[in-house]
Swiss-Prot record:
Bilayer-crossing regions: 11-30
Protein name: ATP synthase subunit b
GO-annotated molecular function: proton-transporting ATP synthase activity, rotational mechanism; proton-transporting ATPase activity, rotational mechanism
Entry similarity comment: Belongs to the ATPase B chain family.
Subcellular location: Cell inner membrane
Membrane-related topology note: Single-pass membrane protein
Entry keyword Transmembrane helix: yes
Gene3D superfamilies (UniProt xref): 6.10.250.1580
Major subcellular location class: membrane
Cited InterPro entries: ATP_synth_B-like_membr_sf, ATP_synth_b/b'su_bac/chlpt, ATP_synth_F0_bsu_bac, ATP_synthase_B_chain
One Pfam family in the UniProt entry: ATP-synt_B
Keyword Transmembrane attributed: yes
Lineage: Bacteria, Pseudomonadati, Verrucomicrobiota, Methylacidiphilae, Methylacidiphilales
GO cellular component, as recorded: plasma membrane; proton-transporting ATP synthase complex
Length: 172
């Protein structure tokens, strides 16, 4: 092989150098680099798992948010409905109270008017009696005795209407 230009000493030295360089590179370069790459691959896989887990938790949180929102809307609708019922009830109650108050005021006014009407009737009776006695005294030309006045009063009162609702006096 010498004829081909191969020197065995140099070839073996080159092979030994190559093996040493390969061993040194493997020991100090390839293994640490492969170890770093493996760690990076694990971190990436772990990050992907965490991202998937976070994505799932986010979806669950979104579902929980939607459920809470739905429940809040239901509760708000219920509260609004209850408020409307209460407002309606309160409105009806206020209307009822106003109607009762109006009835009370109307009844009081009717009673007051009735009392005034009775007072006016009584006053008119007294005036009529006094006028009848005075006119009779003038027609007769003398002062009437107490008995005559009493008899005349009874006669006039018997001809005046006693019942409520009669507006005109009888002429009998």
């Amino acid at each position: 092989m010498h004829q081909l230009g191969i020197e065995w000493n140099k070839l073996i030295a080159q092979i030994i150098n190559f093996v040493i360089v390969l061993w040194v590179l493997n020991r100090f370069a390839f293994k640490p680099v492969l170890k770093i790459l493996e760690e990076r691959r694990k971190k990436i896989a772990e990050s992907l798992q965490n991202a998937e887990k976070i994505k799932q938790e986010l979806a669950e949180a979104e579902e929980a948010r939607k459920e809470i929102l739905r429940k809040a809307n239901e509760q708000a609708s219920f509260i609004v409905a209850e408020a409307q019922k209460v407002a309606s009830y309160q409105g009806e109650k206020k209307i009822q109270e106003a109607v009762e108050e109006a009835k009370r005021v109307l009844k009081k006014a009717e009673e007051s008017a009735k009392l005034e009407r009775e007072k006016a009737k009584e006053e008119m009776r007294r005036e009529i009696l006094n006028l009848v006695i005075e006119i009779t005294s003038k027609v007769v030309g003398k002062t009437l005795t107490l008995d005559d006045q009493e008899r005349l009063k009874n006669e006039v009162l018997s001809k005046l209407p006693q019942k409520e609702g009669h507006e005109a006096y009888s002429r009998n």
